[in-house]
Amino acid sequence: VQWSESERTIINGIFSHLDYDDLGPKAFSRCLIVYPWTQRYFSSFGNLHNAEAIMGNANVAAHGIKVLHGLDLGLKHMDDIMGAYAELSSLHSEKLHVDPDNFKLLSDCIIIAVAAKLGNAFTPETQAAFHKFLAVVVSALGKQYH
């Protein structure tokens, strides 16, 4: 993947403004609520019976934070995102058996949460760069499925 200097600047700028403890739980909760079939991977998280329970679930919040910190790996290795996520791809495909389509669903929820947080600063150019970054991460996470 080729990154322009503008894309690199935009992506790094987005991450420099993120409050992982706030945004991670919001994005992950949204995914579990909007796409309830994704809940099947998280039965050990306890009560996920409705939106209120999901949004108040400490395990959901912790996993959302973990997911956002997982994106730091891609940020640090933008020139080798596929290689950087090889181990996580294996974990999700071989041990956890996660449907790779769910990575795209979660990335969409992350984009929505970031857009809500950045407001007018989430310009079309910003969205394009962030979407490209997440699409490459999603592809890397799904690599072991191919």
Curated annotation (Swiss-Prot):
Name this protein carries in UniProt: Hemoglobin subunit beta
Under the heading Gene3D superfamilies, the entry gives: Globins
Q: Highest lineage ranks of the organism?
A: Eukaryota, Metazoa, Chordata, Craniata, Vertebrata
Name the positions where heme b binds. 63, 92
Q: Name one GO molecular function term.
A: organic acid binding
Question: Would you identify the family this protein belongs to, as annotated?
Answer: Belongs to the globin family.
Q: How does it assemble?
A: Heterotetramer of two alpha chains and two beta chains.
User: Sorted alphabetically, which InterPro entries does this protein's record hold?
Assistant: Globin, Globin-like_sf, Globin/Proto, Hemoglobin_b, Hemoglobin_oxygen_transport
**Can you give the residue ranges of the Globin domain?**
2-146
- Looking at the keywords, is Heme present? yes
| Record-level GO BP terms | hydrogen peroxide catabolic process
Q: Name one Pfam family in it.
A: Globin
Write out the function statement from the record.
Involved in oxygen transport from gills to the various peripheral tissues.
Q: In which tissues is it expressed?
A: Red blood cells.
Which PROSITE patterns is this protein grouped with? GLOBIN
Name the keywords, alphabetized.
Heme, Iron, Metal-binding, Oxygen transport, Transport
**Domain of life, per lineage:** Eukaryota
* Cellular component GO terms, alphabetical: blood microparticle; haptoglobin-hemoglobin complex; hemoglobin complex
